[in-house]
Amino acid sequence: MMGGNMNKMMKQVQKMQQDMAKMQEELGNRTVETTAGGGVVKVVASGKQEIISITIKPEAVDPDDVEMLQDLLITAVNDALRQSQEMVAKEMGKLTGGLNIPGLF
């Protein structure tokens, strides 16, 4: 009797692994977009927490105030990465039933 339960559990684990691999691939193709400075800096990040693009409008480039542009970039990049992590956590939570399993993504 125990063998049947073990086989069933192993099949469930394998299915969850397959579902997770599929979700990771799908999330890698999804993106989040954020802006800073009223839209003068735009950052797009993937579900893999990789920066896809950074767009800077010309009015953000002031040779006398490079620090402002640097601050806008840091803000936008950090926000994009945070949003990407939240997107991944939300989607993985659906798959794992809310269980927080370290190292999933």
UniProtKB/Swiss-Prot annotation:
Q: Where in the cell is it found?
A: Cytoplasm, Nucleoid
Q: Name one Pfam family in it.
A: YbaB_DNA_bd
Q: Name one GO cellular component term.
A: bacterial nucleoid
Q: Which domain of life is it from?
A: Bacteria
Q: Which GO terms describe its molecular function?
A: DNA binding
Cytoplasm in keyword set? yes
The transmembrane residues are none
Read off the InterPro entries from this record: YbaB-like_sf (IPR036894), YbaB/EbfC (IPR004401)
Q: Which UniProt keywords apply?
A: Cytoplasm, DNA-binding
Similarity annotation: Belongs to the YbaB/EbfC family.
Show the NCBIfam families listed in the entry: DNA_YbaB_EbfC
What role does this protein play?
A: Binds to DNA and alters its conformation. May be involved in regulation of gene expression, nucleoid organization and DNA protection.
Provide the assembly information. Homodimer.
- What's the protein here called? Nucleoid-associated protein Dred_0043
Organism expressing this protein natively: Desulforamulus reducens (strain ATCC BAA-1160 / DSM 100696 / MI-1)
From which lineage does this chain's organism come? Bacteria, Bacillati, Bacillota, Clostridia, Eubacteriales
